[in-house]
Structure formats: C-alpha cells, structure tokens
C-alpha cells in the first residue's frame, strides 16, 4: 500500500484513561485534566457495537470529543483508542462518510459509472447500506467496519453477528436476482496486509461470507489510518486465504 489520501478531519478534545465499560455503549474514564480537587471521572459514549476487547480495556488510552447535545446522559464521545500501531478510530458514526468518500473517489473498480447513490435501501428482510445506480446495472453495498487485527491480518467480526450474516446473505440474493453486490470492508488498522472473515469468533458468518464470495459477491477491503486529527486512506488489501475461488 502506497496511498496516503486525506479522507476527512476528525477532531478530538481531550485524552483520557478507560477505567471500565459497564455495557457496550458506556465507558467510565479518568480525564487527563484535573480540577482543584484532583483527577475526575466521566461517563463517555462508545459508538461501536463490537466487543473491542483489544482496544477497550481498563488502563488503555482514549481520545474523546465533547458532545454537542446538552441533554445527553453522556457528555463525551469516544473517538479513538490507543494500540501498538497508533490511534485506532473506533467511532462507527463515521463509517457511512468513509464509505461515501470511497464511492465518490472510485477507489474500488466497481464504483465506476455510478449515476446515483441511495443510502439505507431495503432489500428482502434487511436494509442495506447503499444502492448504487449505474448506467447498465445496480450495485448493492453493505459496509463493515473492522478494528480487529492479528499480526497483519484484519478480521471481522469481533463478536458473533446475526445481523452481519443476514446482510451478507441478502447480498448473495441480490446477486442471484441480477444485480451486482459488494461487501465494503473499512479496515481501521493501518498495519493490515490482508482481510479474512473471523471463523474463530463466528464460524456461521465466515461460512456465509465464503459462500457469498464464491458465488460472485465482490469484496473491497480498504485500509485507513487515523493520524493526529485526520483520517487517511492507505490502500486496498486482498483477502488472506485462497479458499475464496472467485478472487
């Protein structure tokens, strides 16, 4: 990967240390700034449904941004968490904007000749992330954010995902109906060199993923790095294994 294209600015306000995670969407942190009585704690919102056990553990460092809604129960949003390869964006609210950037900049070949981008379109029993109208066909796109890495292998999911399995199954049905279909993987670990479905965490998802790819559903794994207050596109990586016969 040799790209380093600026995607967007994602500012943050303060660093903090994670103390605990009472539930998926709530964290308790100790803020770096102190009051006259010493360090203080805050409740923060975690905008990512994954386990993130390699990033959200007691003692790890976080980047926070002040929430703009004064009526919220949590006054801060978690933007990123510290890892060996730098700060990792773990706020999934940005995934749609990242995907829109990728589509607009045609970083995957299947994004050529797109005439219209329709978000959140219903197909079957699911609502898929995008329907792209092209000059000669239509392309259904489902976006998956990936923050888990083993060595240089990025993998999804980090927890069993019935919803993810259903979405991939719907993409295969879209393909069978005559449309094109794509799984867009947003990898937020810049050391990643390849991607694979996480069979050790969710073997059912891995099997559905494999079946979809072998049937002709396209996969576009894109690597992004969060540096300073900016997100950069680093390039596309392949699938890790040779078990997908259509790649």
UniProtKB/Swiss-Prot annotation:
It comes from the Archaea. One of its GO terms (molecular function) is DNA binding. InterPro entries: SfsA, SfsA_C, SfsA_N. It holds the Pfam family SfsA_N. HAMAP family: SfsA (MF_00095). Belongs to the SfsA family. This is Sugar fermentation stimulation protein homolog. It comes from Methanococcoides burtonii (strain DSM 6242 / NBRC 107633 / OCM 468 / ACE-M). The lineage of its organism: Archaea, Methanobacteriati, Methanobacteriota, Stenosarchaea group, Methanomicrobia.
